[in-house]
């Protein structure tokens, strides 16, 4: 690949930086790593040195791809993202920016002559010509900062995400003189979410780009009279993919969960709305009572597609592709007409991701996990589904971000061998890698082998299990093994790449890595996925033991460890009390130890209420206060999955919590947790460690005070990996 660097690019980058910020406050630039690898061995340091490619955008003329790459400095304990460009065939890569502060959200102008981007919480634009950026102009001045933005098709308007005060209060809200007092005050549920207290709510604002510097007083909150009451976009992961501009720029479709407090905590009822800019009216798109997200307009604006789950309270329900016809208000006496709502993907027993309309509006492209691999599919208006990418291609493909004139799709892909790169997928399903961001590093590594196996379960089903072998594997030599216990519990072990649970890294340390897609995984149809709900101590645990039995039968396997995060951590704590002598050591990250206590302290209550055995037994009566006296309802919420439920599945669930079997613990265990984890609070990890100590079990506790459910800061991540492998080596290699 040709790299266009040198004086011209650096001069343009310097000009850009001088126009954006005070040079004295500019942190050091972080660029690609020049790491040299000894003996071809992958290490945690190698993993963290890789560039992370994201957010590709095809230019309006189809000639260029704009994308971002983040590089990490372990010494500075941070990452920095800059913008890059290549031709649509992957050639002539050029670095557009060289900033010490991250630049993200790069977007083309409608004529392709300007690039807009986000830096330091504000939006800028710079002219683009001959592969270079000119002097940048600041477009926004929003004191609360901007997290993301999108432009209308004609660039005359902008949507941006910022924040307003949330439901959690501080002492100074009651008495301004107490400006140094620190406390959080809540009067309803959902007072914290994922890793933060709800001091602020994300809101989406609409503003004109042709009226000078965009400021809050020139912006319209898209929620109108509901401003400050609800989230838009949905926390904690949502962004502006939950909004969509109509092709003529007169309507905005968006996804919003218009609930708060207890109602929010127990419900997944998120709906699609259409905001009509000329009239200021908002219209509800009728759909189910579960998650409805990610709306996408057809090229002519006559149809709207979106993703939908049918059942309220079930966040792992099948993700369906819905479509509706939308007629302009001008054709219906000033009222927007939404008709012909259809479930388009009924023939597909899989979750739809990232729908993208074809240019002619006659099909929709999307990605989906099917039979353990994520592929690219198309669907017609009649609901006929066709897989484009080969069934035997061991990659995970993302949804297309662009389509060339010859019908070639531009997308991303990854595998267990390499992180995300850009790829071109031709109409016949063949594909070519476009970018090679980390080739200079990965080419130094010794190759390894992966096998696809099917394990027979206790009830006679075939379970897809990936097995990775160490580089230069010799079957006459004995190796320790790691069995990965999946989190979720709904998720999949496919060909994804992770910067924490990296299976290539594990194999490189001399381990055989076993990845069983046990009950509850999402790449094998909804029946396989749903079986786990209400059956945590059941068949999926037997699936793990079946996979362990399979690998231990191999003559080249010595000791076996079981490791997992989140539900995988729950699985570790549960198996610790029932496995007998199957495993030689355990590692649990952010695991559930006491299911009953977790119900009292987690934040998204719909999840345990459903998955702990309540299933569809959810109801809310507005205005109802206090216990209803039926042993299930509390505070107006019917909680059939609660510890006080009288249904058999929840009673079995809590009776078999990992904490119930601690007297049988005898296997060395490492417990890791982040203190900012509000999904599974860190006292769960402390309780597991304390228990192991009291049982006389060799154990270790690692708590990261600044991390959430994930470990994100570079030095913390490095320490996490070192601790992980030190523990495995101590108990499995000795």
Locations of regions flagged by a protein language model:
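Non-catalytic accessory segments flanking enzyme active sites
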Residues: 55-57, 159-161, 184-185, 190-203, ...
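Short loop/turn segments that connect beta-strands within beta-propeller blades
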Residues: 87-91, 127-132, 209-213, 276-280, ...
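Conserved beta-propeller blade repeats
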Residues: 50-65, 100-116, 143-158, 191-204, ...
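Predominantly five- to eight-bladed beta-propeller fold
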Residues: 26-30, 80-81, 163-214, 218-225, ...
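Short, solvent-exposed loop/turn segments at conserved positions within beta-propeller repeat blades
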Residues: 75-81, 118, 196-200, 263-270, ...
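Cap/lid segment of the alpha/beta-hydrolase catalytic domain
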Residues: 437-559, 565-566, 600, 604
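C-terminal motif of bacterial Sec signal peptides marking the signal peptidase cleavage site
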Residues: 17-20
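Active-site-proximal cap/loop segments of hydrolase catalytic domains
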Residues: 515-734
């Amino acid at each position: 690949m040709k790299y266009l660097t040198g004086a011209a690019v650096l001069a343009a980058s310097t000009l850009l930086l001088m126009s954006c910020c005070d040079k004295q406050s500019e942190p050091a630039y972080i660029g690609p790593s020049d790491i040299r690898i000894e003996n071809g061995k992958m290490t945690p340091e190698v993993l963290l040195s890789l560039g992370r490619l994201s957010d590709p955008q095809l230019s309006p003329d189809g000639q260029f791809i704009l994308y971002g790459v983040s590089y990490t400095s372990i010494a500075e304990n941070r990452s920095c993202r800059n913008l890059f460009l290549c031709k649509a065939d992957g050639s002539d890569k050029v670095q557009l920016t060289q900033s010490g502060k991250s630049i993200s959200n790069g977007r083309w102008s409608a004529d392709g002559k300007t690039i807009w981007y986000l830096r330091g919480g504000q939006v800028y634009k710079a002219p683009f010509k001959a592969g270079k950026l000119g002097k940048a102009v600041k477009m926004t001045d929003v004191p609360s900062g901007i997290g993301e933005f999108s432009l209308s098709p004609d660039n005359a308007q902008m949507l941006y995400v910022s924040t307003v005060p949330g439901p959690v209060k501080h002492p100074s809200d009651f008495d301004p003189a107490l400006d140094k007092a620190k406390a959080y005050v809540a009067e309803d549920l959902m007072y914290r979410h994922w890793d933060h207290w709800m001091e602020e709510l994300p809101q989406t604002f609409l503003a004109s780009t042709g009226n000078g510097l965009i400021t809050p007083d020139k912006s319209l909150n898209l929620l109108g009279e509901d401003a400050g009451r609800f989230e838009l976009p949905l926390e904690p992961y949502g962004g502006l993919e939950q909004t969509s501009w109509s092709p003529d720029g007169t309507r905005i479709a968006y996804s919003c969960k218009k609930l708060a407090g207890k109602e929010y905590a127990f419900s997944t009822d998120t709906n699609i709305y259409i905001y009509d800019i000329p009239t200021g009216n908002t219209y509800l798109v009728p759909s189910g009572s579960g998650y409805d997200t990610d709306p996408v307009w057809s090229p002519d604006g006559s149809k709207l597609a979106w993703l939908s789950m049918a059942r309220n309270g079930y966040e792992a329900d099948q993700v369906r592709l819905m479509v509706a016809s939308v007629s302009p208000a001008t054709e219906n006496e000033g009222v927007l007409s939404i008709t012909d709502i259809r479930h388009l993907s009924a023939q597909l027993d899989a979750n739809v991701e990232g729908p993208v309309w074809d240019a002619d509006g006659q099909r929709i492209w999307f990605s989906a996990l099917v039979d353990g691999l994520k592929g690219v599919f198309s669907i017609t208006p009649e609901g006929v589904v066709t897989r484009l990418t080969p069934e035997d291609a061991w990659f995970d493909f993302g949804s297309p971000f662009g389509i060339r004139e010859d019908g070639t799709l531009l997308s991303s892909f990854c595998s267990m061998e390499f992180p995300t790169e850009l790829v071109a997928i031709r109409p016949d399903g063949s594909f070519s890698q476009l970018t090679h961001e980390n080739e200079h590093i990965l080419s130094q590594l010794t190759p390894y082998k992966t096998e696809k196996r099917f394990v027979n379960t206790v009830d006679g089903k075939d379970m897809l299990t990936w097995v990775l072998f160490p580089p230069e594997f010799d079957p006459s030599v004995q190796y320790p093994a790691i069995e990965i216990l999946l989190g979720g519990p709904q998720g999949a072990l496919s060909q994804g790449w992770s910067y924490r649970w990296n299976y290539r890294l594990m194999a490189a340390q001399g381990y055989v890595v076993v990845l069983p897609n046990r009950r509850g995984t999402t790449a094998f149809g909804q029946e396989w996925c749903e079986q786990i709900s209400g059956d945590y101590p059941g068949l999926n645990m037997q699936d793990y033991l079946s996979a362990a039995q399979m690998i231990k039968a191999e003559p080249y396997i010595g000791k076996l460890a079981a490791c997992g995060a989140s539900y995988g951590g729950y699985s570790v704590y549960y198996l610790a009390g029932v496995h007998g002598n199957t495993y030689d050591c355990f590692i649990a990250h952010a695991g559930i130890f006491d299911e009953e206590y977790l119900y009292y302290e987690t934040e998204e209550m719909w999840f345990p209420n459903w998955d702990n055995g309540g299933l569809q037994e959810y109801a809310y009566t507005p205005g109802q206060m206090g216990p209803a006296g039926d042993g299930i309802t509390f505070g107006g919420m019917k909680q059939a999955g609660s510890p006080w439920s009288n249904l058999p599945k929840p009673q079995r669930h809590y009776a078999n919590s990992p904490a119930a079997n601690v007297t049988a613990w005898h296997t060395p265990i490492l417990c890791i947790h982040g203190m900012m984890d509000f999904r599974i609070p860190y006292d769960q990890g402390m309780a597991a460690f304390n228990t192991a100590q009291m049982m006389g079990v060799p154990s270790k506790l690692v708590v990261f005070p600044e991390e959430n459910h994930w470990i994100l800061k570079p030095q913390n991540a490095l320490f996490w990996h070192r601790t992980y492998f030190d523990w495995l080596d101590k108990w499995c290699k000795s």
